[in-house]
């Protein structure tokens, strides 16, 4: 690793001498860093790579999939055979989310809004 560090430092110094780092966007402004103090130091680089690649924890990935399935259901007629299949998949995901201790209220947003409107009207 020592040789690699030396090589990188040499290339950085050459780039600085050529002025390649001058006039970069955000120059002179403080960096906005994520608070990763809760992540063990040996895992921070891996977590940062996954975060920057758009990877999510399994529960949040399931939540995103549930929202996509809900959008699909809104576009399918109730008598369509695909409706039952998508509905079953959504129910399974909802169960998994609840078992993981996550709220599934986001799936019932329209119903809750209509119910509140009805209660407030009377």
UniProtKB/Swiss-Prot annotation:
Pfam families in alphabetical order: DJC28_CD
Organism per entry: Escherichia coli (strain K12)
Name assigned to this protein: Uncharacterized protein YhdN
InterPro entries given in the database record: DnaJ_C_subfamily_28 (IPR052573), DnaJ_homolog_subfam-C_membr-28 (IPR018961)
């Amino acid at each position: 690793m020592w040789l690699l560090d030396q090589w990188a430092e040499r290339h950085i110094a050459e780039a600085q001498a050529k002025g390649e780092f001058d006039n970069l966007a955000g120059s002179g402004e403080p960096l906005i860093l994520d608070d990763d103090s809760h992540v063990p130091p040996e895992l921070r680089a891996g977590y940062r790579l996954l975060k920057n690649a758009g990877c999510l924890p399994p529960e949040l990935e399931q939540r995103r999939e549930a929202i996509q399935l809900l959008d699909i259901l809104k576009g399918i007629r109730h008598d369509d055979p695909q409706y039952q299949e998508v509905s079953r998949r959504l129910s399974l995901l909802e169960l998994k989310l609840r078992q993981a201790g996550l709220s599934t209220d986001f799936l019932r947003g329209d119903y809750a809004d209509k119910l509140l409107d009805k209660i407030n009207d009377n």
